[in-house]
Structure formats: C-alpha cells, structure tokens
C-alpha cells in the first residue's frame, strides 16, 4: 500500500526512520567519546576517574558497533519491502524490537559508565556463563542474549517479507549477510580458557563480520541505491554485485589468517593469511569501478539528490583506501611482525570502518530520509549543499586522522619495534614522542564532529526540492 504522503512506495517502510535517527544519535556519542579518548592520549588524567581511558574506549567501540547495526536494520526495513514489492511482514514487531534494542543498548552503555566493570560482571551474572572481558565483546552476557533475541525477531520479520514477495539478487545478498552476521555473533558466547583457542574463534566474530558478511550488506545497500538513482538495468548491477560478493568471501574467509600470525597457531597460517588477505583489496577496488561506472557512464536520469550520489561514490573510494590500501600496508606477515598493535592498526581501522560501513549507512540515510520525512526524492538545494559540506568535512577529516595516525605508527615502529631490545625505546617513552600526532589527530576529530553536525542539520532544515 502506498504511504499516505506518496513519498514511500510502501507505508511500512516508515519503520526505518526511528532506526536511522537513533543510529545517528549513537554516532554522535561515538564521536564524542572518540574525542575524549584522543585527549586522554595527551592529557592522561582528563576526566579521570569519572571516565577512565579503558571505559571511554569501550564505549567508543561499542557505540560504533551498535549504531552500525541500527543502520543496517533500518536499511533492511527500508529496502526489503521495495525489493520484495510488498509490505513489511510486521511493522509492529519492528517497532517492538527497536525499543528493546534501544533500551538494551542504552542500559549497557550506562552500565559501562556508572558501574565498575568487575561489578557489572557480578551484577549481570557473568559467572553463570562467562563471556565478558574481551575486546569489542565486552557486553554483559544478558546483553548478548538480548542481541540474539532482537536478531532472531529481525531476521524473521525481513525473512517472511522476502519469502512472500519478489526475490531479487539484492535482497538475497542482503539476507545472506544478515543471517551470517547473526550466526557468527554466536561465537561471542564461546569463551574457552585457552587463550589461543579464544583468540582463534574471537576473530570469527570480529574479522568475519567486518571483512566478511558486512561486505555483503554493504554491497547490497550500494546496489539498491545505484539501481534507484541511475536507472541502470538491474541485471547489470546484479552481475557486478555477484562478482564483488564472490571476491569478498573468497578473500575474506581465509584472509582471517592474517589475525593468526602471533597467537600460537601452526605456521602455515603465515602463508595463508598473507596470500589471501593480500587479495582482500580486490572486492573494494571492484566496488569503486562499479560505483563510478554506474553513476558516471551509464546514467539515464538526472537524479535530483546530488548528495546521495556523492555518498555512493565516496563510500567505495574510502573503503578501498581504508580497508584495501591501508589494510594491505601491514597485512603481510614479515611487515605485520613490526606493525602489529601500533598506531598503523588504528589508522587502518578508522578509515576502513568509516569508508566501508559508516558511509554506506549515511548513503542509504541520505537516499531514504527525504522520503521518510514526506519530502520526496530530494531536499532543497540549500539542504543538499549543507549535507555535501558535511560529507567533505567528515571525509577530509578522516583522511587526516588516518595520515596522522599512520605517521605516528611509522615513528612508533622506528623507535620501539625496529631496534634491538636493548636499544628500543620503551612504550611510554615512545608515546611521548608521538604527542604531536595525537594533538593533530584530535584537531581533525573536532573537524569531523563539525561535519557530522552539518550532516544532521541538513535533514532538520530540509524542504522539498523546487
């Protein structure tokens, strides 16, 4: 059924709006805690003991994961009805799951901030099924169980929509990615006492999310947006999508081995990890060719929302640079021996997450939000200009954050890792030498926040395009 305002093809697509709005609120929180962390690198007692560095980092990374999950869920609720050519199976269930997930997320973050972590573990019964205390998987066991319940309800809702409607390559790839995301998260409940075994399966969640099934989600969202804004034949875009997804899975699954270099597994992982992870830039490069070829050479219509085309091209370029180029720079075992755990890792992580996943969520929000607000295909020119200012401020700021962290990482390797043990500078002494880069990174982070505010204001002030 067409929505009352005529901007949405199906009324149930409107349930995507709260997911997008809450995702952006959490995104702001993530950036604020990133700025707190960045300042704590150079002013060690900033906000101590109220917000220690380890707590700020935990909140920063957890907010990243949760806001992206909200973004993916909103994207699915928006595009699956349109791809399936039918209403969402249960908008009511989508609303219930939104409030459950939002409440669980807020309570978990408040728990990090207000209760000592050991106390939080006791309070939530972690001793009954110990899963806490691992990087990125710090959530209490009860929160992890809540995520599983929300994921099952979500998959049921979108899965039933797909089953009773039209089947397309885009919806099938998206569903494959979402199901894989949920299944791989189950390994967060496996916490063996053996540290090597723990790390081996820990990466099945962390790596196979961000360098595996999340790439399927990114590819499906990008393909959907390009179909809508270019008018290119769906068959052409679907062929590109199949090639990209095949390359992502072939390189990404065995490429997990580049995380196994130094955790105590057999030596053959040095070869497997190096060879296959060296192939991981290929799907991201293919996405660049895909987006630019589709938008610039096969255009059949002048889509009025210029900002969404900018986001669609930008996400592929930044993903290729961050996940592809910066990932390749330190993925080979002989190089990773020196760079592992340095600021080069942080440089890669920042640009890769922003380019591949933050930007693809902002792409679908840029496309969908005018319709969700009842405006139509695009907002007025002033709002689009403001949004594009937000794009450039955030993107250029992230490039400089990456460059400053890369410079810090190279110097860290030179001072701390390359010299023989007796001549190597200690960790803390090395950090003092990197302070200038941390200050520069903090400044770039402030610019990033300004860009994010501009992006948000573009929707608040937007009116229909003339």
Curated annotation (Swiss-Prot):
Q: EC number(s) on record?
A: 1.7.2.5
An annotated GO cellular component of this protein is:
plasma membrane
Residue numbers binding heme b 2; high-spin: 348
Q: Could you tell me the superkingdom of the organism this chain comes from?
A: Bacteria
Instruction: Give TM segment ranges.
Output: 19-39, 61-81, 95-115, 142-162, 169-189, 205-225, 243-263, 270-290, 308-328, 349-369, 391-411, 434-454
Q: What InterPro entries does its record include?
A: Cyt_c_oxase-like_su1_dom, Cyt_c_oxase-like_su1_sf, Cyt_C_Oxase_1, Cyt_c_Oxase_su1_BS
Protein topology in the membrane: Multi-pass membrane protein
Main localization, broad class = membrane
Location(s), subcellular:
Cell membrane
Q: Which residues bind Fe cation?
A: 207, 258-259
Q: Which residues bind heme b 1; low-spin?
A: 60, 350
- What's a Gene Ontology MF term here? nitric oxide reductase activity
- What are the alphabetically sorted keywords of the record? Cell membrane, Electron transport, Heme, Iron, Membrane, Metal-binding, Oxidoreductase, Respiratory chain, Transmembrane, Transmembrane helix, Transport
What is the enzyme's class at the highest EC level?
oxidoreductase
Biological or metabolic pathway of the protein? Nitrogen metabolism; nitrate reduction (denitrification); dinitrogen from nitrate: step 3/4
Which reaction(s) does its UniProt entry say it catalyses?
nitrous oxide + 2 Fe(III)-[cytochrome c] + H2O = 2 nitric oxide + 2 Fe(II)-[cytochrome c] + 2 H(+)
One BP annotation, GO: respiratory electron transport chain
Functionally, this protein is described as follows: Component of the anaerobic respiratory chain that transforms nitrate to dinitrogen (denitrification). NorB is the catalytic subunit of the enzyme complex. Shows proton pump activity across the membrane in denitrifying bacterial cells. The mononitrogen reduction is probably coupled to electron transport phosphorylation.
* Entry's family note: Belongs to the heme-copper respiratory oxidase family.
Quaternary arrangement and interactors, per the entry? Heterodimer of cytochromes b (large subunit) and c (small subunit).
Protein known as: Nitric oxide reductase subunit B
């Amino acid at each position: 059924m067409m929505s009352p305002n005529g901007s949405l093809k199906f009324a149930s697509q409107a349930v995507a709006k709260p997911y997008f709005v809450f995702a952006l609120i959490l995104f702001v929180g993530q950036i604020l805690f990133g700025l707190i962390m960045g300042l704590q690198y150079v002013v060690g007692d900033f906000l101590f003991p109220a917000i220690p560095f380890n707590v700020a980092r935990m909140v920063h990374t957890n907010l990243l994961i949760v806001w992206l999950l909200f973004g993916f869920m909103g994207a699915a609720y928006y595009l699956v009805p349109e791809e399936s050519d039918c209403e969402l199976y249960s908008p009511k269930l989508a609303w219930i799951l939104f409030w459950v997930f939002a409440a669980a997320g807020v309570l978990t973050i408040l728990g990090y901030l207000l209760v000592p972590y050991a106390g939080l573990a006791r309070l939530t019964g972690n001793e009954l099924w110990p899963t806490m205390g691992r990087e990125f998987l710090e959530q209490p066991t009860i929160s992890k169980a809540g995520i599983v319940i929300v994921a099952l309800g979500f998959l049921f809702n979108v899965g039933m929509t797909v089953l009773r409607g039209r089947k397309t390559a885009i919806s099938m790839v998206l569903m494959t990615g979402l199901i894989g995301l949920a299944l791989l998260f189950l390994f967060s409940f496996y916490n063996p006492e053996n540290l090597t075994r723990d790390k081996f399966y820990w990466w099945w969640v962390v790596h196979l999310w961000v360098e595996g099934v999340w790439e399927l989600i990114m590819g499906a969202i990008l393909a959907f947006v390009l179909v809508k804004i270019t008018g290119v034949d769906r068959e052409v875009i679907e062929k590109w999508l199949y090639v990209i997804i095949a390359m992502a899975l072939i390189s990404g699954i065995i490429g997990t081995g580049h995380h196994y270099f130094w955790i105590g597994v057999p030596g053959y992982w040095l070869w497997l990890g190096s060879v296959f992870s060296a192939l991981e830039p290929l799907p991201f490069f293919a996405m660049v060719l895909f987006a630019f070829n589709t938008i610039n050479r096969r255009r059949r219509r002048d889509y009025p929302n210029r900002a969404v085309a900018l986001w669609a091209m930008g996400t592929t370029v930044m993903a290729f640079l961050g996940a592809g180029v910066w990932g390749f720079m330190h993925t080979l075992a002989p190089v990773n021996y020196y760079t592992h755990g340095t600021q080069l890792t942080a440089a890669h992580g920042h640009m890769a997450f922003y380019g591949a996943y933050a930007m693809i969520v902002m792409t679908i929000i840029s496309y969908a939000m005018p319709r969700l607000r009842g405006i139509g295909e695009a907002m007025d020119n002033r709002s689009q200009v403001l949004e594009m200012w937000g794009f450039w401020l955030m993107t250029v700021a992230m490039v400089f954050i990456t460059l400053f962290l890369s410079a810090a990482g190279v110097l860290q390797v030179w001072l701390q890792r390359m010299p023989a043990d007796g001549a190597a500078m200690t960790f803390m002494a090395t950090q003092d030498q990197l302070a200038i880069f941390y200050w520069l990174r903090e400044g770039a982070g402030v610019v990033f926040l300004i860009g994010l505010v501009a992006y948000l204001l573009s929707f608040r002030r937007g009116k229909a395009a003339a």
